[in-house]
Structure formats: C-alpha cells, structure tokens
C-alpha cells in the first residue's frame, strides 16, 4: 500500500526467500513520492535529542549516495541566520554534531558564511547577513522505489501492482491471502509469513484485515509542498526557520522551478485522497516571503503535492504533542502467536535500506 512495500524486497530476495508484493495502487503512488526528496540525517531531529536516529540516517546517507549516484546527488544547504530564531551558537553546535555523529567521506562539512558575499545571499533580503552551509543529499524518491521493485522482480519476486489484499486467514503455520486487482480478478496466495508494510494504512490493515493488535499506533501527519517558478539561479538549497519552530526547505527543482515545503498537520481524512489546502499554501508563501526578495502568492503556485506520514507512537502517547516533536524513526512489531506477521510502523526514505535489513534479520529465524 506504499511507504513503500518494495523498500524491503532488495534485502529479502538476496536471502533467497520467495516473495509476493501486493500494492493496491501503483509503486510510490502515495507517501513515498510525496517526500521533500532528500537523503538526509535530519538536522532538526537533534533538537529532540534523537541522536541515534540522526546517526543511523547519516550512515545511510553515505551508503545510498555511493550506491545510486544516478538518482541521488549531494546538495549544499544554506541556513540564513534569523536573529529572532535559534541563536547562532545553537546552530553551530547542531552542525558540529551533524558533521561528526557518523563517518563522513563524500560530503564537505559545515561552516559559517557571509550572505553579503556568498552566491546564495543574492536572492535573500538584506536583513540576512550571516548564515551557515552544510551538506545533505537529493533523491528521485519515486524512481528509488521503482528501481527496488524492478531489482526484486529480476531476482524472482512477484510484483503485483493495482492489487489489494482484501482478506487474510491465519493458520498455525501459514497465511492464506485473497488479492483483488482493480479489474476484480482475484488471486489466492499462501505464505509462511505476512509483512505489513502498508505505511499510513499499516495500523488499520493490522486491525481490520489481519485482526491483530499492537502496543503501537500511527499518528498520521500531512505534509504538503508547493512548486513555483525558480526564485534563485544557483545550485544551493535553503533551509528556513519558521517562528513556530518548524523547518521549511526551498530546493532547486527540475531546472526551472523551486520546491518549497513541508508542512506538518495532523490528518484525519481519506488517506487515498490527500491534497494541500489554502492555509498550507499561505503558510509556505509567507515563510518564503520572509526570506526571499522575490515575493510569491498562492497564484504563483504552479503545482503542489501532499502526502501522509505515518509517525509511530506508543498506544498511550499524548496526541496533543507537537507533530514536529514526534519521532521519524520506525518500529518493527513481530507477532508469532500463530503464523507470523511483521508490521512496520513509521520510517523515512533515508533509512529504508536499514529498516529492510533489520526486518529481514527479524523474520529470518522463521525460515530457519
């Protein structure tokens, strides 16, 4: 159901397991293609003391940039220092940690800059005279998902797109699954183990279809992006601080455009039909106008997209916690009371490979 089930296939087929992937729509048609398209450690997660997550993501960033340079590339980010936001010493400390939490060979480190003389300072308002530069990576997120699925198929996995898992029956030693395509053709599959990698649908699939339970729950957060005609003509991206504490990126996009996002809003609507609303567009335009000389308005938006992030929480966690403070890490829940089922809660695109590795390590004993 996307976020994305194909992310783990690369590791599964290498261990010679027989795999059927069931995707109710198309590959990467939901959350996986609605990211900010970054391979990054998550600089802002340091404020929440998520050092382990950041370190893991930084290690994965290095691995991914080496393994798929045709769909990923290094990207330098400029953070203008806004005197009304985080103090300079805090930013320096955070960037120092970001540079040193994991071994870094491919990317240059961070440093301070004068925006009066730096190329990236030209498009910014005069009030921003100092800033910081650091490194992360860009990724074609949808293509990454599709490439994983293609590689799995080439090694024997069966990839069934536009095919929903409509029912499962659990026995002591196996599952029986009923799969239905969009043209109403049905397929019956028997499996020794079921992996629930349904992203935003993982909790509902576990409860409604598998009839299982877990001590985890998903908090669904909508993230929206806007695309406007390019606001700058250089290869740097920007990371902006909003007065509400959130971080928003402005990234070169498809040569002629600038991608701006993301928002963080609790979502209770239809996960199959997610779209940006007027307040989100205004939010992103206003933040852009706070930093850039060239003002934009909602009428300048040439495209927008939205996705739902499945953030994992313990069942008794407070839903009133700020969405930005909820972890972007993942949790794996293996139920072996009868035929085993592994449910994946949460996750981010940067750590997809590590998640898959840990998931297959967890289920490997089932196959002796």
PLM segments and residue spans:
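Single conserved hydrophobic/aromatic residue that forms the stacking wall/gate
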Residues: 2-13
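A conserved short coil-to-beta-strand element within the FAD-binding core of flavoproteins
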Residues: 161-175
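C-terminal catalytic lobe of FAD-dependent flavoproteins
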Residues: 135, 141-144, 151, 210-224, ...
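Dinucleotide-binding Rossmann-like beta1-alpha1 core, especially the glycine-rich loop
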Residues: 37-120
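Short linear elements at protein peripheries
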Residues: 98-150, 158
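Glycine-rich FAD pyrophosphate-binding loop
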Residues: 14-33
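Core beta-strand elements of the Rossmann-like FAD/NAD(P) dinucleotide-binding domain
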Residues: 184-193
